[in-house]
């Protein structure tokens, strides 16, 4: 989705396809270790699945690009720093063509919720 970009060692890149229905957020996440997509039924479950994926792969950065024809609606999540269950990174929002920076998991969740309310 994006061109060349400097990425800190140990960072992680994922893609999120989200659906909001009746105040419920569901979707699939894609990336290293989840190439076929991991479904989730809530944002809290998404966070737990992302934690598990990052724990199992360790600090090895694996570039992953979505396959040709992948949905243009997917959000691109880049977790640049992760320590003590806190994340910092950026989320690219395709519908509005912007990038949001977050300094905690809570801030990431608020960005996602606000994106779907707008």
Regions found by a protein language model. Name each.
Residues 18-34, 82-96:
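Short aromatic-glycine-(Arg/Gly/Cys) micro-motifs in beta-strand/loop hairpins
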Residues 31-38, 47-50, 91-118:
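Mixed-charge, glycine-accented linear interaction segment located at domain edges/termini
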Residues 1-23, 48-85, 117-118:
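Intrinsic disorder/low-complexity detector
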């Amino acid at each position: 989705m994006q061109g060349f970009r400097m990425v800190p060692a140990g960072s992680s890149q994922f893609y999120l396809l989200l659906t909001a229905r009746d105040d419920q957020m569901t979707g699939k996440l894609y990336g290293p270790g989840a190439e076929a997509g991991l479904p989730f039924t809530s944002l809290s479950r998404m966070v737990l699945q992302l934690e598990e994926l990052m724990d199992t792969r360790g600090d090895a950065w694996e570039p992953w690009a979505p396959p040709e024809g992948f949905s243009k609606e997917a959000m691109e999540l880049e977790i640049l720093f992760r320590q003590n269950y806190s994340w910092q990174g950026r989320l690219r929002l395709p519908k509005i063509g912007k990038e949001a920076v977050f300094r905690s998991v809570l801030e990431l969740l608020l960005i996602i919720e606000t994106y779907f309310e707008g």
